[in-house]
Amino acid sequence: MEQDSNGGSDAGRDYARDLGDEPAPAIRDSAPDFLAPIDADAPVSGHNPPPEPTSSPAESPEQDWSRARDLIYPAFRPVGTQGLDIEAIDRDSLAAHSQQSHAQPLLDVGPAELPVVYTIDAGAYDIVVNGDHLLSWGVEPSDIQDAAMSNLFNWSATAPWTDEVSGDRRLISSDTGAGWDAVRILLPAVLAHLEAELRPAGRILIGLPERHLMTAGSLRPGDDDFATLFADFIVETSGGADEPIDRRVFELVDGRLVEFGGVTSLR
């Protein structure tokens, strides 16, 4: 490259480019045949065509119940979450207004009035089941509930527990990170496990601060400080969570989850 003798420029002339260093252009020796079959391997505007899709959108879980039913799980949401009451939903009414959007989530009521939604596990994210999904699948709300609880049961059967002991105090937690740790408390088998492990030592306190954590501990007679420490932990964990659920402390009483009334409530 040499400096341009005309001056006024910081860039010199590129004689190699001026003289041409590209391949010789292809010159047609005949007119194009517009009726000839298109070469599938020919470049398009200098690029290769995109690959053909391997599946149809109609086969996605959002459209195909046979694919969705093995991917549906329940999930807790904070109190105040709005949606379509799954127990009162009328499929015929939804179908009569099928041209309208029914994007509100199907909403169930869990223990201690905790809202429950249903989600499709899509791997890196979840899809919350709504009224449009119900219409697309052509199933009853009870089918969604049954499938979700069945999938949760199968997962929980092999999911591990974290067991922590400090002196006479003991915590049993589910913190696998799979996304179904908190909602695991819906399963009778889980309630029975906590009863067997923690009831002999005292009352059973339970926290559901966020989606990825369910923790339970024994409140022993005379250890009132444990209840305070447990409550502080739940509030702190829920406050720093990406998907918080509830800051309350619950108690397992007669096989039911109820709001903890304090250390003197059952004395």
Regions found by a protein language model. Name each.
Residues G12-S166:
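Extended, low-hydrophobicity segments enriched in charged/polar residues
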